[in-house]
Regions:
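AMP-forming adenylation/ATP pyrophosphatase catalytic core
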Residues: 103-110, 114-342
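ATP-dependent adenylation/nucleotidyltransferase module used to activate substrates
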Residues: 1-136, 147, 157-158, 242
Length: 342
């Protein structure tokens, strides 16, 4: 059985024909994507269903994305989508249709631990395409139904297999943008979303140095990110970078590049792929962004679903709202868990 989700898409721009398709289609479920999926299902001679989850997607993912940016955090909506939409709502629908497993096109591997029998989430063979970072939120229950057939292959190998089978999507371009944000313009999206739904728009506020001295004014926290240097609109003797987005004061804190480095930080909303945290500190590799290089360190579970990461060497731009994901296991490629950076 083939299933595709119809996700929320931004409404047409002012003046557009309301009866026409949205001018800013969701990249994951555009009319073209649905047509392609339907053609593949027909070629494979399997049933094909489109399941509408627009409203739960908007409430759970899009509102969260907006709220996080307005609060001065930098969210990764794919994490929440994978846990609550793809591997909850979609999994429920798949099981209701009589499916035994849910197979997706993520580049990641899953297998059983030979000692404990628990499901293990592991990096893909093609490390350049590995998507384990955005799947660290999955539970044992979700992993028990998950299949990731692409995890052992490279992207060129997958395209070659699709071409051999005559599938019409063999050469289709891939998208790495946030699916509901057109042209990756998240600043414009936050502004438009606030206007369309009558929500508070990002408000201007002060740009402060580390001593609290005001150096200038910002146009709204959503327009900045930790590590940013260009576009601050302030003159200084040395290059200044965004160090912190202070939601409580609606302030952008800036300072020298050296102040961006951190070797210790905490995370909250921590999840563990084996469902229970380790008994104590664990040697791990930590990734703080999707495309970041992993750094060796020690992670220690804390009360209230939190954890502390201590890295062997400091890294730059550890960004609140992004996930820190912990890797370990015998081969070092197992996803142990992760949490949102505080």
């Amino acid at each position: 059985v083939g299933i595709m989700l119809r996700l929320w898409a931004e409404p047409p721009a002012d003046g557009a024909d309301e009866d026409a398709a949205p001018t800013r289609e969701n990249a994951c479920c555009s009319i073209e994507s649905m047509s392609d999926a339907r053609r593949v299902a027909a070629q494979l001679d399997i049933p094909f269903y489109v399941i509408n989850v627009e409203e739960p997607f908007r409430e759970t993912i899009v509102d969260y994305f907006y709220d996080e940016y307005r609060a001065g955090r930098t969210p990764n909506p794919c994490l929440r989508c994978n846990r609550t939409i793809r591997f909850t709502l979609l999994l429920e629908r798949a099981l209701a249709l009589g499916a035994d497993y849910l197979a997706t096109g993520h580049y990641v591997r899953v297998d059983d631990d030979p000692v404990t029998g628990l499901r293990r989430l592991r990096r893909a063979s093609d490390t350049a395409k590995d998507q384990s970072y955005v799947l660290h939120v999955l539970s044992q229950y979700q992993l028990s139904y998950a299949l990731f057939p692409l995890g052992e292959y490279t992207k060129p190998e997958v395209r070659a297999m699709a071409a051999e089978r005559g599938l019409p999507v063999a050469t289709k371009a891939e998208s790495q943008e946030i699916c509901f944000v057109a042209a990756n313009d998240y600043r414009g999206f936050v502004r438009r979303y606030a206007e369309a739904r009558g929500m508070p728009a990002p408000e201007p506020g002060p740009i402060l140095d580390l001593s609290g001295r005001q150096l200038g004014a910002h146009s709204g926290l959503a327009n900045y990110t930790v590590g940013q240097r260009k576009g601050l609109g302030i003159a200084a003797r040395e290059p200044l970078h965004v160090l912190q987005l202070d939601g409580a004061r609606n302030a952008v804190i800036v300072g020298p590049a050296a102040a961006l480095e951190r070797a210790c930080f905490t995370v909250h909303q921590t999840t563990w792929t084996r469902d229970t945290p380790p008994d104590g500190p664990v040697r791990v590799e930590v990734k703080v962004r999707y495309k970041a290089q992993p750094v060796s360190g020690l992670v220690t579970p804390l009360p209230d679903g939190r954890a502390e990461a201590m890295l062997e060497q400091p890294i730059r731009a550890v960004t609140p709202g992004q996930a820190a994901v912990f890797y370990g296991g015998a081969a070092g490629d197992e996803v142990l868990g992760g949490g949102l950076i505080e």
